[in-house]
Amino acid sequence: MSENETSKTGGNAGVPGSGADAPSLSDSPAISGNDAVNLAAEQAKNTAHRNIPTLDDLPIPEDTANLRLGPNLHDGLLALLPLVGVWRGEGQADTPEGGQYSFGQQIIFSHDGENYLSFESRVWRLDSEGGTVGPDQRETGFWRINLQDEIEFVCAHASGVVEIYYGQPINERAWELESASTMVTATGPVTLGPGKRLYGLLPTNELGWVDERLVDKELKPRMSAQLHRIIG
């Protein structure tokens, strides 16, 4: 197993353009609090009644991706509250091993009342006409945040990578993370360097995110997507 480490250096919260067509998060037009609430209420007409499937006989609280259903969100997670839900959409990738391609993605941020968020991402490749080609990448992990608004994200990739990210909220609708440790198994992707991620809600209340990786000593966008809420 190999390990790459990077220090937390902060950096520009903006997302540069790239072959991955990164959505612009920090440069998005501002949205007022009232407009955000009204837009969320309108979207909730189609998503508020839905939740992720669960089993009924578990003796402890089930995971929920809907703040209206299931256990109450832990008070320590209020800075991450807007992320909770199921998000689905499309994005662009530009990777050393796969080249440039389009993909579909679903991200689930859920909780069980404890002081962490569960994270799951599934990615599938798309052809030039938007049709599904097949599964591509998968991640699972946990987000935590302390009283100083310091975020910890432990992320495991199905390809044989485990990463630890640290970060902080940029504002109430955006979160920036930087990898402190990237560990790759003997059969994992040797081209995956340390990186940085940015997640944020766009003025449309869609979730945009970008993953940047160190390539030739320069951070370059690897994957990015724009996702709409389907649950929560």
Curated annotation (Swiss-Prot):
A motif (GXWXGXG) lies at residues 85-91. Residues 1-33 are annotated as: Disordered. Residues 1-10 have a biased composition (Polar residues). SUPFAM superfamilies: Lipocalins. Gene3D superfamilies: 2.40.128.20. It comes from the Bacteria. Transmembrane segments: none annotated. CDD domains: lipocalin_heme-bd-THAP4-like. InterPro entries: Calycin (IPR012674), Nb(III)_bact/plant (IPR022939), Nitrobindin (IPR045165), THAP4-like_heme-bd (IPR014878). Belongs to the nitrobindin family. This is Ferric nitrobindin-like protein. It comes from Corynebacterium efficiens (strain DSM 44549 / YS-314 / AJ 12310 / JCM 11189 / NBRC 100395). The lineage of its organism: Bacteria, Bacillati, Actinomycetota, Actinomycetes, Mycobacteriales.
